[in-house]
Amino acid sequence: MQSIKKVIGSIDFGILSPQEIRKMSAAEITVPDTYDEDGYPIEGGLMDKRLGVIDPGLRCETCGARAGECPGHFGHVELARPVIHVGFAKTIHRVLESTCRECGRIKLTDEEIEEYFHKFEVTGNRKKAKDRLIKEIHKKAKERMVCPHCGSPQFPIKFERPTVYWELRKDEEGNEYKHRMMPSEVRDRLEKIPDRDLPLIGLDAEKARPEWMVLTVLPVPPVTMRPSITLESGIRAEDDLTHKLVDIIRINNRLKSNIEAGAPQLIIEDLWDLLQYHVTTYINNETSGIPPAKHKSGRPLKTLSQRLKGKEGRFRGNLSGKRVNFSARTVISPDPMISINEVGVPMAIAMELTVPEKVTEFNFEKLRKMVLNGPEKYPGANYVIDPEGRRIRLMENNLETVAEKLDIGWTVERHLLDGDVVLFNRQPSLHRMSIMAHRVRVMPYRTFRLNLSVCPPYNADFDGDEMNLHVPQTEEAQAEAKILMEVQNHIISPRYGGPLIAGIQDHISGGYLLTREGAYFERTEVEQMLMFAGVDVDRLPEPDKVENGVELWSGKTIFSLLLPKDLTIWYRNKLCDEPGRCEALEKLIEEKLIPDEEEVRALAYDGFTYILNGKLLSGAIDKTAYGREDGKLLDIIVREYGVERARQFLDQVTKLAIWVITHKGFTTAIDDEDLPTEALDRIREIIREAEERVNRLIEAYRNGELEPIPGKTLEETLESKIMAALAEARDNAGKVAERYLGMSNHAVIMAKTGARGKILNITQMAAMLGQQSIRGKRLYRGYRERVLTHFKPGDLGARARGFVINSYKSGLTPQEYFFHAMGGREGLVDTAVRTAQSGYMQRRLINALQDLKVEYDGTVRDPTGIIVQFRYGEDGIDPMRSWKGKTIDVNRVVLRTLLKLRGKG
């Protein structure tokens, strides 16, 4: 009969009673030692064979199993005197304050008790409400100085961390004195509390009697939980828990013998406190108020609490996150020639990682050859598994034997092959695209190869980043990874609904060089670039022009070969500096919808992209076409032609752009920042005017003529007006630099097309750095009444407060360099602090939201069925599948319908 599967309904935690500890114990431990001189476990010692065995050749005396099979068994130590369990110290204090010192009843009247029990029934299982009631009961009972049940006087109890309780008593004369409550007295008081009162103090009589919080018996964990290790020198090193238990047993034995010998109370109390210290640090070695237990080397011991807590602890380190097999990690390198959904895997890794493949009649011959190749020859196999589940390791001497035995139904653990599905991940994994499924491409050398377009979701660069690769081991896992996680399914970001996997840097500059006005290519170049990009065409289109008998094709015509044949889209791109020219084209399209190609070419302008039926008629390609976040063209291809077509387009367009940029040349150097004399004169003029403006503002402030901005003081008004004047000066200087450098300048091309950087960066390189700021204000910290000694005290002028008039090209003065370093320092500190804060915030958020899910009715619920949101995200829309927050783009549907109808005539 099959075993009936059961679902866990709930888990209850309780406290172990002394009886339970003794019952589950296999041996009482009395000897504070581990092994004898022969290296054999001592009976009654901490490595007693009844607690399990870890040494090969020995058998467990409790279950009879050998090392590796025996799970280990608990032991126990009978404590000579009770000690407080540090984890319950605060709870004990609360319970002592709430109950009578004589009769043990809770210090509430019978009517109040009845009323609170009724309230508990009403709250049911709502934890927060219950906790509130328990807090209220404690507050009320604590203030009662006479027991309502037996009438005996009560005394306040002071708790001294970590485990000391004082009763503030009064003598006959009314003088207050402190009486220390030893753990035995505490335990006696807790024993008096009747079971019926326990729910009112938040305890359950069956699972957690209060006196169990004071230990009389200490459980000793199994040997398997605290194994010894043998060092290279042959010396045995014990686990931290074993060290601590040795201390506990040694002091416990001393305390026992002193009690039996009738030693003075003072000595007994000292030893008792020492036992309490050892038990406390055994449970938690980070208890505040006492020094941590340390090794001879000074390293604090890792005891029970430290094994569970924190990032390296049992929960986060071994349960939520654990190390896995079938994974690899190495440095990443760029490879523009592989597809976005591929990953280049080094041959060494492909031969080490395996995929289990079942032998069928279809793949029998292929797998047989792999078995014959063995582990040393690629493509081979490392193991085979027979139908009984026996693993056979393939070695040079058994390859032919195993290959002969191989039959349908066996499993071969073969090397990674091209096309296998693997998971690729870069840490920190901040969003779901930090781990995606790629197809294997086995390659030489020792680094993973990654297509450049896939860097943004991983936030990867190639300055030494390492990435992880995981190999799914079952067909189900591979299918799941392929369907849910493959790279092309994540081109659109779920954050903002625009492309995240897109052309970057060189791809965008190259796209511009290919498609800008006046870019023409000869037949040999066209054939080369199409072959390089992997574009399959039956024959080349007609040349755009013939010059001196040479056929020339425009970059726009070549780019059009990559586009779907019925794609129509138009938009203003980043290069649209002359709105009038863009408006002329928009008007033409509005009037005719499908204007004549020649009409469009007559008005064509790099700043306005117009694609009609798969032909690029106007505009250069920049970040607005297939860049990250902005890529309108890529976005349309994903949504209207599917992710596979988008992958093909992205693969081809990036290779094409790389061919153009490498063959036509694209360099940026220091001479890109050279400005003519008249430009430098104009910039100096702008700086002079700005400084004069600032001086006028300071004068107006000192003469009391400055009008304060509403809500700001005079000083704040002055500062904000100075900041505005200096920011305007920097922007004007930037415009001058931009005008003189022009679109023939490669640095400007990068900034204007959105490939890399902004015009501000060029301004700072060529014109001037401008005002340095800390927290949005001018620099003000430094010497008294001035930032640096190079300026007069009280000088509020532009240069004295961090205005840098030089550019990187012209070089900064020492004062300017110092000001610039002040601004830069803030950026570094800010980055470091933000990273830590956002990481911790994300962890808390994940922990809070991890068990919420969207049900089939569209609501978001927690596991108990409580509704968190009636519609996911308040609108129920997935940004990946929506059009700017709408479920459908009506204009686009109308446009496509009209185009189809016009096409049919």
Curated annotation (Swiss-Prot):
Keywords for this protein: Cytoplasm, DNA-binding, DNA-directed RNA polymerase, Magnesium, Metal-binding, Nucleotidyltransferase, Transcription, Transferase, Zinc
Q: Where does Zn(2+) 1 bind?
A: C60, C63, C70, H73
* Any one GO MF annotation of this record: zinc ion binding
Q: Where does Mg(2+) bind?
A: D461, D463, D465
Domain of life, per the record? Archaea
Q: Which top EC class applies here?
A: transferase
Function recorded in the entry: DNA-dependent RNA polymerase (RNAP) catalyzes the transcription of DNA into RNA using the four ribonucleoside triphosphates as substrates. Forms the clamp head domain.
The protein's name in its UniProt record: DNA-directed RNA polymerase subunit Rpo1N
Organism lineage string:
Archaea, Methanobacteriati, Methanobacteriota, Thermococci, Thermococcales
Q: Which gene encodes it?
A: rpo1N
